[in-house]
């Protein structure tokens, strides 16, 4: 069976010859216990939790972290100095009451995210090709910037299309640049493929929005290749689902 690029990344990072469910759980347990020790030492938000877990099964007895926890105590979840924070992502809550939800990232967090993105994108981004990125570009450590850096590490060329262009402008950019790969949301991709059926796109990864099966099927038919839907979250460093 073919080993995925993400599996290979984890093996290299953890110094493992191979990955099984057993050693994956051992790695997870070890990381959790090291984090719990840091929480105790630094009196972090989770400092009241046990200092050690004997098995992953014990996670079932621990409380969930809620959106309210992030809004009210997000700064207490940071286990490094303020100077070590490279990026803060803020998500406003719905309605007019309640504070914003903030997630903090260090330079090491962003580096891990780029490595994760590069491993995943290597399944469809090839050296020497171009990748059109229809994600927000908001400065150093932004989502678009992290994806672009991952594309460059694969020897490919990122096209920073962003999310503010009209479909007409995006289509013009497609014809001008001729990218082989697309990274962005599913509905804009499908709209572009319908508007310009003869574009250069042959592969795509979609994220940041739900991708219904009917949309996926039509995109795959128009691309002539498998579509890669990805679901991540701010709380897991953008990459982890």
Predicted regions mapped to residue ranges:
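Active-site glycine/GP-rich loop and adjacent strand/helix microenvironment
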Residues: 1-30, 34-37, 154-241
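Nucleotide 5′-phosphate-binding alpha/beta core
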Residues: 1-92, 98-112, 119
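Residues within well-ordered alpha helices
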Residues: 48-49, 69, 120, 150, ...
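Gly/Ser/Thr-rich helix-start
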Residues: 96-99, 143, 233
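AMP-binding/adenylate-forming
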Residues: 107-120, 130-190
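Short internal alpha-helix immediately C-terminal to a glycine-rich phosphate-binding loop
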Residues: 117-124, 195
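Short helix-loop-beta connector
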Residues: 125-129
């Amino acid at each position: 069976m073919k080993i995925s690029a993400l599996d290979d990344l984890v093996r290299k990072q953890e110094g493992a010859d191979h990955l099984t469910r057993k050693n994956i759980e051992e790695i997870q347990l070890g990381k959790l216990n090291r984090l719990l020790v840091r929480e105790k030492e630094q009196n972090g938000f989770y400092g009241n939790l046990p200092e050690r877990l004997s098995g992953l099964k014990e996670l079932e007895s621990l409380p969930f972290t809620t959106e309210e926890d992030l809004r009210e105590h997000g700064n207490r979840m940071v286990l490094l100095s303020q100077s070590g924070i490279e990026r803060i992502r803020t998500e406003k809550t719905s309605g007019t009451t309640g504070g914003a939800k903030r997630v903090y990232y260090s330079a090491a967090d962003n580096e891990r995210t780029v490595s994760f993105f590069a491993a995943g994108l290597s399944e469809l981004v090839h050296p020497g090709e171009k990748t059109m990125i229809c994600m927000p570009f908001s400065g150093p450590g932004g989502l678009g910037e992290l994806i672009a850096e991952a594309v460059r590490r694969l020897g490919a060329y990122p096209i920073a299309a962003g999310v503010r262009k009209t479909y007409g402008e995006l289509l013009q950019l497609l014809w001008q640049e001729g990218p082989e790969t697309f990274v962005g949301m599913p509905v804009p991709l499908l709209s572009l493929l319908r508007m310009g059926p003869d574009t250069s796109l042959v592969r795509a990864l979609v994220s940041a929005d739900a991708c219904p099966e009917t949309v996926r099927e039509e995109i795959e038919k128009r691309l002539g290749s498998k579509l890669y839907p990805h679901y991540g979250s701010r709380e897991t460093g953008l990459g982890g689902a």
